[in-house]
Amino acid sequence: MFLQRLFQARSRRSVSWLVLTSQVVSLLFSPFYLPVIAFAALLVFSYLNMLPLLTKALLLVLVYCFTIALPHFFIFLYRKFNGWTRHQLGRRERRYVPYAVSIASYASLFYILVSIHVPRFALAIIAGALSIQVVCALVNSRLKVSTHAAASGGVVGSLMAFALIFSFDPTGWLCLTVLLSGMVCTARFVLRQHTLRELGWGVAIGVVCGFCCVIFI
């Protein structure tokens, strides 16, 4: 009896740690943050690092405002207005307004970056994120696609495309991004936010959109 209780207590502790870890991974690799991280990587590892520090900072602040701050603010207002929790907002039929807010914000950012003549390969990051949002919104009526999985897949697809454009060996980075994508999908599955089918479709949409936008823009 004592051993059984001890085993149950350890099992509950293990499950709680697993859920907590999944929540942290899900938060750190939110689809809202990935465009900012990708843009920052371009400012460091491409010829854009020759820009003045103030210019790079202003570009990052601009991207942050339109991909994180504004969407989060308006989605928060929408959720509070309806009295929903984050989990309740995640229901498939309630995701259209958050999608519309994100798409409008990303489209505005894309227009601004085009207006200030940002290089095409940098525009491709925002275009990829925008196209992922659009495709996920279109298929939302039939399938609750995971935007976390789609965003992580977009990073993988974009990396493959940049490897072709700049002719570098992406093996190490590709392994890392695939591993991170797997971590994100596992976290969403553990939290019971999505099924394996929804996660798989999300990754597939992300890879295709990320790759095509970088190649063709």
Per-range role (PLM):
Residues M1-S22:
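Short, Lys/Arg-rich, polar N-terminal cytosolic tail immediately upstream
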Residues V25-S46:
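The first (N-terminal) embedded transmembrane alpha-helix
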Residues F45-T55, W84-H87, S115-I116:
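Membrane-interface helix termini and inter-helical loops of multi-pass transporters
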Residues P52-A69, R92-E93, V203:
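Loop-to-helix transition at the N-terminal end of transmembrane alpha-helices
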Residues A69-F81:
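Membrane-water interface of transmembrane alpha-helices
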Residues T85-V101:
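Juxtamembrane helix-capping/reentrant segments at transmembrane boundaries
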Residues Y99-H117, V139-S141:
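C-terminal halves and exits of single transmembrane alpha-helices
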Residues P119-I217:
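Membrane-embedded catalytic cores of phosphoryl/pyrophosphoryl-handling enzymes
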